């Protein structure tokens, strides 16, 4: 046997070994519509780093932030097909496919942010994740990100509910959100996040609704200087993985992904609270007026949206009662108070 043949035979086991490693590797593309530096994006990137390290290189992770892979709806379709492996998705998009999640989409269903966090950390939060996983959505729901408390921001001040009458307000394309704004007296306009800035600039809309970090990061304050603290929605948002990708993972890899997603859930809320406080400070410095409602003024928004809760919450009365009965975790309530200071 000549030297070259011996060398080839000797190299075969190594070649098979390398080939096996290449086949075992799972490559994860994580798509985000939000920009780099946004609290959920930071927590998701940290999750990815841990995933690469703790899987010993069997799983690779790359973040695509800032909507470079498309709008949220487009990204969801890519995750469903397996072209993108993971994302964080708004429940406004999930709701039409998995109706149960619309319970979390109902206006004023949570008393405050601490109450919402208590819910998603517990039994009800896991039940909703399971509903998403077991639906036709074609994704595995792993954990929750805090999507913040949504308020109105407008070109003209909204100091009481009557000021909203006739205003065109951008919302996500979910009937619950559209009817919420309509019942408040405005005109809910479904629109992708990336279209809001120009729509405000050109007068296509009079305002939108979201949390302070999103309002700041997307520069919407440049065209809408009034931020009214309605707190009408407090929305958690799930981290999801394509079912096709999930089924490629070994059981121990699935366990690792779930563990790290849960860790990201806890890390993100600390990042969120800081970014929310920082955003509010920067927005005020940029000339934004934050309008705080009296209890009576806020109740007017609550009462106006009762038909939405009655209509969309009717099939889930028992679940809503369970949510209302949950007592806020005292530690979360304390953290919430500190963040607000």
Where are these regions (language model features)?
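N-terminal secretory/targeting leader peptides
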Residues: 12, 25-116, 123-124, 130-341
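Bacterial Sec-dependent signal peptides at the C-terminal "C-region" and cleavage site
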Residues: 21-23
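Bacterial N-terminal signal peptides that target proteins for export
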Residues: 1-10
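Bacterial N-terminal signal peptides
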Residues: 9-19
């Amino acid at each position: 046997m000549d030297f070259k043949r011996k060398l080839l035979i000797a190299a075969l086991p190594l070649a098979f070994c390398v080939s096996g490693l290449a086949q075992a590797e799972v490559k994860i593309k994580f798509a985000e519509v939000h920009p780099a530096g946004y609290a959920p994006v930071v927590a998701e990137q940290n999750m990815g780093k841990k995933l690469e390290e703790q899987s010993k290189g069997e799983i690779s992770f790359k973040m695509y932030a800032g909507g470079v892979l498309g709008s949220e709806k487009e990204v969801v379709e890519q995750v469903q097909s397996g072209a993108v492996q993971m994302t964080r998705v708004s429940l406004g998009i999930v709701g039409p496919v998995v109706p149960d999640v619309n319970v979390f989409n109902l206006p004023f269903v949570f008393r405050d942010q601490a109450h919402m966090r208590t819910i998603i950390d517990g039994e009800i939060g896991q039940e909703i994740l399971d509903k998403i996983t077991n639906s036709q959505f074609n994704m595995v729901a792993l954990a929750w990100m805090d999507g913040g408390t949504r308020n109105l921001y407008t070109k003209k001040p909204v100091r009481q509910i009557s000021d909203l009458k006739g205003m065109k307000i951008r919302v996500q394309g979910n009937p619950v959100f559209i009817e919420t704004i309509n019942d408040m007296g405005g005109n809910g306009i479904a629109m992708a996040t990336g279209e809001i800035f120009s729509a405000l600039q050109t007068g296509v809309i009079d305002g939108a609704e979201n949390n302070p970090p999103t309002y700041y990061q997307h520069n919407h304050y440049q065209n809408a200087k009034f931020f009214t603290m309605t707190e009408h929605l407090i929305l958690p948002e799930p981290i999801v993985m394509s079912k096709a990708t999930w089924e490629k993972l070994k059981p121990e890899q699935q366990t690792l992904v779930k563990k790290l997603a849960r860790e990201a859930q806890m890390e993100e809320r600390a990042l969120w609270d800081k970014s929310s406080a920082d955003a509010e400070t920067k927005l005020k410095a940029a000339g934004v007026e934050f309008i705080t409602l009296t209890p009576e003024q806020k109740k007017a928004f609550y009462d106006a949206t009762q038909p939405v809760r009655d209509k969309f919450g009717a099939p889930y009365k028992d679940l809503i009662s369970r949510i209302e009965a949950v007592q806020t975790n005292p530690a979360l309530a304390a953290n919430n108070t500190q963040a607000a200071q």
